[in-house]
A protein has these predicted regions:
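Short edge beta-strands and adjacent turn/loop segments
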Residues: 24-54, 86-98
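Short, non-transmembrane amphipathic alpha-helical segments
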Residues: 61-83
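N-terminal presequence-like segments and adjacent domain-start helices
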Residues: 1-21
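Short linear motifs at secondary-structure transitions and domain/linker junctions
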Residues: 18-21, 27-34, 61-65
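Short beta-strand-to-loop capping motifs
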Residues: 55-59
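Short secondary-structure junctions
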Residues: 17-24, 78-83
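A generic structural signal for short, solvent-exposed coil/turn residues
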Residues: 15, 36, 45, 79-81
Length: 100
């Protein structure tokens, strides 16, 4: 079974490899991160019962947000050791030439 920091690293890599993800999110009220010793993985919170993956998605969206989240969950859940995997979309990254 992977350590929390190994799982956080793997979840971050999986999320960033997902179409539509611009970057890892920072969380809303507190920083979303997993720590072990001097190492920090931003955007992933590994708890005893769940893994939270915080992301910033690109606009325009290549597909609906629930599909992007589903792809992240499909990549992370098999590595999560039975923990519930949740995706939080913290923000949208809008290109300078895009209108909302």
């Amino acid at each position: 079974l992977a350590t929390d920091i190994q799982l956080a690293r793997a979840a971050s890599v999986a999320a960033l490899a997902t179409e539509g993800v611009h970057a890892m999110g920072r969380g809303r009220y507190v920083e979303a991160a997993t720590y072990e010793g001097p190492e920090k993985v931003s955007g992933v919170v590994v708890g005893p019962d769940e893994v939270e993956v915080h992301v910033v998605v690109r606009w325009p969206l290549p597909r609906p947000i629930p599909e992007i989240a589903g792809s992240i969950i499909a990549r992370v859940a098999p590595q999560a050791g039975g923990r519930k995997t949740m995706v939080m979309v913290d923000d949208l990254e809008v290109g300078a030439d895009e209108d909302l």
